[in-house]
A protein has these predicted regions:
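Terminal amphipathic helices with adjacent charged low-complexity linkers/tails
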Residues: 82, 100-156, 292-417, 593-657, ...
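Mobile "lid/hinge" segments at catalytic clefts and subdomain interfaces of large enzymes
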Residues: 199-341, 347-350, 466-469, 474-486, ...
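Extracellular/luminal Protease-associated
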Residues: 288-295, 556, 778-822
Length: 920
């Protein structure tokens, strides 16, 4: 705890007859180190952590002074931030479990007690990313999907159960419970923790990191938390502070109130668009102003959820009366809620705040209008009334159709001339093709038709206003006799069981089911690409006619090929609009002026005819939701169903690796582990494995979805007699490095400019010029002892906090990446794996420098080690001796990050320290 320098800041706090210790921020103000009223609330919370954990070793008095000295226009200072807990989801949690198991195995091989590898902060792993929508539209869809989920993931789930018994304070929320961020919001989040440290009770603010980029959703209840890669989360679990540069903090001042008919989803799409324009990457965002009181906590959580889409590290709302009311509504203990109030008031962390910010952004809630986002980025907001013009323009832009809606000459890839009018292999915009489904149903589909309509994702299923709104709209539609077209795959995947409970109590679940929105699972499903298969005849029609079909979902991401590889255009919308566009069956429609369908009397029905009013939604929520619901549903949150209880899992301190397993294999990271750190040196005679454009996502780098037998990962499984129907997804195979390294840079939509933008995981081997897969090329380079680099444009690694995007990069032999800019989590994950993230100088890039990607590359300036933000020199030399020289900056901001790189990664550093302590 706090060093002698700040021992006065450790004070006693009395509450209800109990005495607690606390790190009192007001003492720092009394000492003249800060003006608390001027510090953003998020910075105060960071400051409390630094103060409380200052031990004179990893966290010293200078760190406390640095955090206390935050000012809007002062250069960043490095501070070590220690979180109070960690949350994991299973796709990123399984590789974390595998890494922890591998660390124990490495310790055991060195003759060290393996239990030295032990989490030092509490951890919750929520299994939510594995359920897929194989069955839908029936009463038994949920049971069938869960049954298949266990069949596919039994081995992974056994490893998770092993971890639960092997590690202290490692809790597992079993399948079928909910989505990690909604469970976190409704139950796990405490706002303030009571913790025992060395026999004394302490009060500490709830802070966390999570292995999912949408962890900032917890900011809706005033908790500082953000997404990190599994690598960094594991380090935090093992007691490592997160060394970070104090961020700029952008204050968003909200005014006004949402107009009638506008939803929290519409609001978050507006804010996401706005903050992407402002530029908040690597920054904290705090919301304040009179408009905040007009938003429910669920609305706030919807906004906080999309922090990564906005570009920020966190988007938070400081705790106020509405926060405490939400804690009460969701079944938190009344005595704890009062403790939260008193502690936060004592720390100056409660109620309306107007501190000084790096930048202030004004946002008027009155200006929000019904909107969607698409076709492939969450910040591409489109007013609902503009969709009928948007979609034809999109198809022309992509070269799918020419002027007048006729098919363009070409293959639908965008290569055709936009003004071509001669019929090619495609389909005119206004024509349909007949398709006979497996059950004999005949449908017609064309460009713009909605094939997936999914009420999904914690972004929106955590918000009763939009869920009840969707239910009421479904009721009104059913009463009019409206139906969903047979070609639309409908699904409802609540983020917690409480949602189903209040929809049933409000008698709205039946109305949703009447339209086909049956519960398919309690997990992420379509939002993360687990939408399941489309009917084979529909997929065949898409391929045969180059159809640009669509999906509409209440999620937070719509990247290319994420929702389904056959669906080209994906749109984010509120749950009521998801139902509305499902009813319409197409996206090229103006629902403000065109009918959504016809009723039983043949009369045209418009969206406004079935849209529920705000007061009806509010009254339904009031009548249908109670604290007892939350208490009941979360009383057995760690127990699971009969399937989970019956699952036979390994026991013991060291995991028993199965060399025949295709799901869980010991990774190579800590095998033959040296106690000396390897350091870092110049890179010579490197080759570019890929050259990429802008906004290459972690989905592009490490896809999570299905893959075929023709790809390297599929070939590896086929060689081990795994049938194609048991391949499962990349995400489910993250405990197997053999599959994952073969899947790196293997997304079907990634475009490698070494092959003139050809889609898929292909590249050129130099100097032979042979086209091959990225994995096969990397293996040839490995045999030739050739180091590799990757070059890219802006926003490299945007998207999900996918540690395998960095692990796979490392295992392919890539020593450095060079991009114009990076998304924070991917950059940090690269550092966490010992890979150098380098940035071109302003105004430069591989294209601007005239690089082709077939050169030899030398990175110099590392002969004496690495310094934070070091400027390095790169020389690119062609086969005929011509050279291009340019400078890059190492995006390694702190001395601790340098240590990670020089040790080959953060876990390598942690293991090296643990082993050294035990062996010396």
């Amino acid at each position: 705890m706090a060093t002698d320098t700040f021992s006065d800041a450790i004070r006693e706090f009395e509450h209800d007859g109990e005495t607690y210790k606390m790190a009192d921020l007001t003492v720092l103000e009394e000492q003249g180190l800060c003006d608390l009223d001027k510090l953003p609330v998020s910075i105060r919370i960071l400051l409390e952590s630094v103060l409380r954990n200052a031990d004179g070793d990893q966290i010293d008095a200078d760190s406390v002074r640095a955090a206390a000295s935050w000012e809007p226009d002062v250069p960043d200072a490095e501070v070590p931030f220690t979180v109070s807990r960690v949350v994991l989801q299973d796709l990123t949690g399984v590789p974390a479990v595998v890494d922890l198991a591998a660390l124990r195995s490495a310790a055991d091989r060195k003759g060290v007690d393996p239990t030295v590898v032990e989490p030092e902060v509490p951890c919750d792993l929520v299994i939510d990313h594995s359920v897929q929508v194989d069955h839908f539209g029936t009463d038994d869809a949920y049971e069938k999907n869960v049954e298949i989920e266990y069949e596919r993931n039994e081995e992974r789930y056994r490893a998770i159960k092993w971890a639960q018994q092997a590690f202290d304070e490692f809790n597992v929320v079993p399948p079928g419970t909910g989505i990690v961020h909604q469970v976190n919001l409704e139950h796990l989040g405490r706002v303030v923790h009571e913790r025992e440290v060395d026999g004394e009770q302490w009060l500490v603010p709830d802070t966390l990191v999570g292995t999912d980029s949408h962890t900032p959703m917890i900011g809706g209840i005033g908790v500082v938390g953000w997404g990190v890669g599994g690598i960094e989360a594991e380090a935090a679990l093992l007691g490592q502070p997160i060394n970070m540069s104090l961020p700029d903090v952008v204050g968003v001042r909200l005014s006004g109130e949402l107009p009638e008919g506008a939803t929290a989803t519409d609001l978050v799409l507006h804010i996401t668009e706005k903050l992407r324009q402002v530029g908040v990457v690597d920054k904290f965002v705090e919301f304040y102003g009179p408009g905040v009181s007009q938003l429910s906590v669920a609305d706030r959580a919807t906004i906080s959820n999309m922090a990564p889409e906005q570009g920020s590290t966190i988007s938070m709302f400081p705790v106020d009366e509405k926060t405490l009311e939400y804690l009460e509504l969701t079944g938190r203990d009344e005595e704890h809620i009062e403790l939260v109030r008193e502690y936060l008031e004592a720390q100056g962390l409660f109620g309306e705040q107007e501190p000084e910010y790096t930048e202030t952004v004004e946002f008027d809630l009155d200006e929000v209008e019904p909107s969607l986002a698409g076709h492939k980025k969450p910040h591409q907001r489109i007013p609902m009334g503009d969709l009928d013009d948007h979609f034809p323009a999109l198809l022309e832009e992509q070269g799918v159709i020419g002027a007048g809606g006729e098919p363009a000459i070409g293959d639908g890839s965008g290569a055709a001339a936009a003004d071509a009018t001669d019929a090619g292999p495609g389909l005119p915009l206004d024509e349909k093709v007949p398709v006979e489904l497996e059950d004999g149903t005949e449908v017609e589909i064309g460009h713009g038709d909605v094939l997936v309509s999914a009420i999904t994702s914690c972004t929106n299923t955590s918000n009763p206003s939009v869920m009840v709104g969707a239910g009421l709209l479904a009721r009104n539609a059913a009463e009019q006799g409206l139906e969903i077209p047979d070609y639309v795959k409908t699904s409802l995947a609540p983020g917690s069981r409480v949602v189903t409970e209040y929809l049933e109590r409000a008698e709205l679940l039946d109305d949703l089911e009447e339209l086909g929105y049956h519960v398919v699972g309690y997990g992420c499903t379509t939002c993360i690409g687990n939408s399941g298969p489309l009917p084979e005849p529909i997929e065949n029609a898409i391929d045969e006619h180059d159809l640009w079909t669509t999906s509409v979902l209440s999620g937070n991401r719509n990247f290319e090929a994420r929702i389904h590889p056959k669906i080209q255009a994906n749109y984010l919308a509120s749950p009521p609009l998801v139902v509305a566009y499902g009813l319409a069956g197409r996206m090229d429609i103006d629902l403000e002026t065109e009918p959504i369908g016809t009723n039983d009397d043949g009369e045209e029905v418009y969206l406004e005819d079935i849209w529920p009013d705000t007061e009806e939604i509010r009254q339904t929520i009031h009548d249908s939701i109670s604290p007892e619901m939350f208490e009941e549903k979360y009383a057995s949150v760690y127990e699971g169903d009969d399937r989970w209880e019956a699952l036979d899992a390994p026991t013991g301190d060291v995991y028993d690796w199965d060399s025949e397993s295709t799901y869980i294999r010991e990774p190579p990271f800590f095998q033959d582990f040296p106690l000396e750190k390897p350091g870092v040196d110049n890179v010579e005679d490197a080759r570019a494995l890929l050259t990429l454009g802008d906004t290459v996502t972690t989905d592009h780098i490490s896809p999570a979805g299905l893959f075929g037998e023709d790809l390297p990962a599929g070939q590896w499984l086929t060689e081990r007699d795994v049938p194609v129907h048991e391949f499962n997804t990349y995400g489910s195979r993250r405990g197997n490095h053999e599959v994952m390294m073969r899947g790196t840079f293997a997304n079907v939509r990634i475009e490698n400019e070494l092959l003139d933008g050809k889609e898929g995981g292909y590249t050129v081997h130099h100097p032979t010029g042979e086209e091959t897969t990225v994995f096969e090329a990397s293996e040839r380079y490995r045999e030739e002892d050739t180091p590799l680099i990757v070059m890219a444009g802006d926003e490299l690694g945007t998207g999900s906090s996918r540690d395998w995007a960095a692990k796979g990069t490392d295992l392919l032999g890539i020593r450095a990446t060079i991009g114009k800019s990076y998304e924070r989590i991917y950059r940090d994950n690269l550092i966490g794996m010992g890979v150098l993230p380098l940035q071109f100088a302003e105004g430069e890039g591989w294209e601007e420098l005239g690089l082709e990607g077939d050169e030899y590359f030398e990175i110099s300036g590392l002969e004496n080690g690495l310094e934070p933000n070091a400027e390095l020199d790169v020389t690119a030399e062609t086969d005929d001796g011509e050279t291009v020289e340019f400078s890059v900056t190492a995006q390694v901001d702190t001395p601790m990050a340098v240590e990670y790189v020089e040790n080959g990664g953060v876990l390598h550093l942690v293991l090296r320290r643990l082993l050294t302590e035990e062996l010396n």
